[in-house]
Structures are given as C-alpha cells and as structure tokens.
C-alpha cells in the first residue's frame, strides 16, 4: 500500500520489460515458524502469578506444534499461524509445598481471537487438590492471553519489514489528484510570524468530516492499534513515534502526519490534535475517535473538526484508505480481504 503522500509502488513494474517482482508486489511468502517457536517459549516461560495462597509459574513448554507465515499478495499482507501448545506449571504454597500441573492450548490460530483461544488448566496426576489451581485458572490464564496477544502483535510487525517497500529512490510525491501548488502560489503565502502566539492555529476556512467503519475485533484491540507504536508502524508501513498519553506527541508516515493526544479513555475514545504537513503552518484539526462495542465487533466513529476546506476530500479519503483499510488489511479486521 502506498504511503500517505507517496506514489504507489505497484507502478514501478510498468517501467520494466521483464515484469520483475519489484517491491515484492506479486506473491511472496515469509516463514515465521522458527521465530514464532522462540517467541512463544520466551513469552510463556515468563508467566508467573502470586497471591495469598502462594505462587504459580510456567516452568516448561512441553509441546509446541504448528507453523506461522506471512504472505504478501499485491501489496496486501495475509497472516497465518496455527499452534497447539502444552505447558507445565509449578505452584508453591505459602507453607512451601509444591504442586505440578499442565496447561493445554489446542487452538492458537489466526481463525480465533485471543479471547476465543481455549486454555485448559489442570493438576498433574496424583497431585492433591490445592487453591493454587484457581489462581492459575484465573490470573494465570489472563497472563497467558496477554502473552498470546503480544506474540500476535509482534508477528504482525517484525515480519512485515521489507515485504512492502517504499517508492523508488525513497522519494515522496504528492498523491494522485492533489496537484502541488505553483511556485508563485507558495511564495505568495506569508509565513506566520514566530513572535505571534497561535494557540488555536491560523485562521483559514475549515470544515467538519465524519466517518464510520466496522472492524471485526474488540474495542480493546482496536484501541491498541491506534496507541501502540509497533502496530501503527505495521499498518502504515512506515516509521512512527508516539506517546499514548495526554499531551503525548506523535509523528507518522515519515513525518507527513503529526499531532498530540489531548484525551484518551481506553476502549472508549481518543481525542487528538492532528495535522498533515502540507497544511498551513500552525494549523491542527481536532480528531475524535469513538469505539462502540457491537457484539464482538467494533464500530469506529471518526469526527474531524477544523479540516482545511480545500483538504476535505483528501483527508476523508486518506483516513478511509490509509487508516481504516490499512488496519483491516494488516490485521485481518475486515469482513473480506482487500
């Protein structure tokens, strides 16, 4: 997918008589099985919980069967992973008595969300009953799901590098349908005075846009996509920096998009000052993202206020394509593959 503010890499193929797979535009596949094995073992073996009854920890990954891969089809990433896992855990009571048990995870796959993955916790044969089983089933299972979520997120970021490359020579060009201003017009725009305070931006004609989109994931997961640096880099296919706190800054898409978070309520809404670098200096729009739970799906409502009037359609199309479709293509949150 082309970056916001750049040309589409697919067209480089037209310049070659041999139709070489430039920028991996045609079908490519990357095997992530070995990496996944190491990553899952590291994450699972870090699981440890404790309460007034004692503590429990995963001590061994006794079985890890499966595979993982990433496919790039015409610039769109498709993730596949399927694992059957067995773990051994040890519990130690406050009195120092040790207990051993097992965990089975038969269906860690791309067909199930993390919350849908089955996790079975049990004591080893001939072990006496202990309240530590309840600790492992409740708090231990929560940490196991967190570990699986981290695995899935990192799989979708670390292995995308190089599968969709930037435009030729790394040069940024204006999007189609957005002609650059003539030199005379750019010169005619006076630069804002550095001594003049601009708390609310420059005065220009503005407009409001609203968009709605449904994602096949939970509000919690979709919120993470917008507030986790690695996930933002994954769906934009470009470097990004962000601090997901009130007052935290963000820079995305090689600096083409920047702003500041002004309010964040996990799983509920995000409010931010947002600008595209071609906008008049000092001007920010206010973007509000509202996450609505729709029985396992999420309806995302985007409202943008203060959009420069000449940029209305470009901004609308940019959010639809580079945010919404980009997220669906990268993480599989769409009803269909784009």
UniProtKB/Swiss-Prot annotation:
One annotated Gene Ontology cellular component of this protein: extracellular exosome
In-chain residues carrying the UniProt-annotated modification Phosphoserine: 193, 258
Top-level taxonomic group: Eukaryota
Keywords of this entry: Acetylation, Chaperone, Cytoplasm, Endoplasmic reticulum, Host-virus interaction, Isopeptide bond, Phosphoprotein, Stress response, Ubl conjugation
Molecular function via GO: ATPase activator activity; cadherin binding; Hsp90 protein binding; protein folding chaperone; protein-folding chaperone binding; unfolded protein binding
Phosphotyrosine modified-residue sites: 223
Keyword Acetylation annotated: yes
Record PTM text: Phosphorylation at Tyr-223 enhances binding to chaperone HSP90AA1.
List of residues that carry N6-acetyllysine: 3, 212
Induction, per UniProt: By heat shock and treatment with the HSP90 inhibitor 17-demethoxygeldanamycin (17AAG).
SMART domains on file: Aha1_N
Matching InterPro entries: Aha1, AHSA1-like_N, ASHA1/2-like_C, START-like_dom_sf
General function of this protein: Acts as a co-chaperone of HSP90AA1. Activates the ATPase activity of HSP90AA1 leading to increase in its chaperone activity. Competes with the inhibitory co-chaperone FNIP1 for binding to HSP90AA1, thereby providing a reciprocal regulatory mechanism for chaperoning of client proteins. Competes with the inhibitory co-chaperone TSC1 for binding to HSP90AA1, thereby providing a reciprocal regulatory mechanism for chaperoning of client proteins.
Cross-referenced PANTHER family: ACTIVATOR OF 90 KDA HEAT SHOCK PROTEIN ATPASE HOMOLOG 1, HEAT SHOCK PROTEIN 90 HSP90 CO-CHAPERONE AHA-1
Protein name in UniProt: Activator of 90 kDa heat shock protein ATPase homolog 1
Gene name, Swiss-Prot/TrEMBL: AHSA1
């Amino acid at each position: 997918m082309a970056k916001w503010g750049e040309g589409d890499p697919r067209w480089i193929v037209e310049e070659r008589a041999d139709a070489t797979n430039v920028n991996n535009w045609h079908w490519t596949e990357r095997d992530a099985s070995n990496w996944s094995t190491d990553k899952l073992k590291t994450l699972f073996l870090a699981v440890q919980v404790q309460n007034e009854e004692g503590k429990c920890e995963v001590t061994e990954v006794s079985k890890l069967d499966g595979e993982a891969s990433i496919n790039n089809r015409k610039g769109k990433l498709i993730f596949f992973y399927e694992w059957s896992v067995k773990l051994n855990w040890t519990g130690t009571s406050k009195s120092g008595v040790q207990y051993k048990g097992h965990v089975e995870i038969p269906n860690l796959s791309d067909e199930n969300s993390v919350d849908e993955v089955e996790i079975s916790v049990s004591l080893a044969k001939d072990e006496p009953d202990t309240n530590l089983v309840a600790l492992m089933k409740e708090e231990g299972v929560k940490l196991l799901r967190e570990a699986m979520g981290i695995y899935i997120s990192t799989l979708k970021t670390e292995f995308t590098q190089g599968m969709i490359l930037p435009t030729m020579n790394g040069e940024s060009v204006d999007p189609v349908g957005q002609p650059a201003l003539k030199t005379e017009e750019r010169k005619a725009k006076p630069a804002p005075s550095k001594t003049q305070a601009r708390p609310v931006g420059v005065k220009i004609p503005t407009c409001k846009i609203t968009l709605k989109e449904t994602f096949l994931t939970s509000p919690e997961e979709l919120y993470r996509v917008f507030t986790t640096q690695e996930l933002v880099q994954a769906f934009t296919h470009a470097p990004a920096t962000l601090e997901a706190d009130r007052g935290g800054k963000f820079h995305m898409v090689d600096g083409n998009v920047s702003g500041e978070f002004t309010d964040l309520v996990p799983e509920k809404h995000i409010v931010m000052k947002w600008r595209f670098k071609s906008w008049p200096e000092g001007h920010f729009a206010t973007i509000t993202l509202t996450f609505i739970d729709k029985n396992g799906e999420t309806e995302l409502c985007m409202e943008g206020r203060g959009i420069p009037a000449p940029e209305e359609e470009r901004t609308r199309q940019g959010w639809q394509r580079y945010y919404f479709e980009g997220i669906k293509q990268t993480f599989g949150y769409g009803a269909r593959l784009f």
